[in-house]
């Protein structure tokens, strides 16, 4: 779903960066949130989640 937005290496690095316990980074979260929240409503609607694969939403 992010093939046109992010490189595969960037996606893998992001997933690895948050795999450890207590590794939450709010700045990174909000960058990701801004990409997913396509209508800038402040919420991620079901339609916006449809752009993600099943693996990305688990």
Curated annotation (Swiss-Prot):
The lineage of its organism: Eukaryota, Metazoa, Chordata, Craniata, Vertebrata. Is regarded as an important allergen. Ca(2+) 1 binds at residue 45. Keywords: Acetylation, Allergen, Calcium, Metal-binding, Muscle protein. InterPro entries: EF-hand-dom_pair, EF_Hand_1_Ca_BS, Parvalbumin. One of its GO terms (cellular component) is cytoplasm. In muscle, parvalbumin is thought to be involved in relaxation after contraction. It binds two calcium ions. PROSITE patterns: EF_HAND_1. Belongs to the parvalbumin family. One of its GO terms (molecular function) is calcium ion binding. This is Parvalbumin beta 3. Ca(2+) binds at residues 37, 39, 41, 43, 48. The modification N-acetylalanine is found at residue 1. It comes from the Eukaryota. Coiled coil: none annotated. Residues 24-58 form the EF-hand domain. It comes from Merluccius capensis (Shallow-water Cape hake). PANTHER family: PARVALBUMIN (PTHR11653:SF12), PARVALBUMIN ALPHA (PTHR11653).
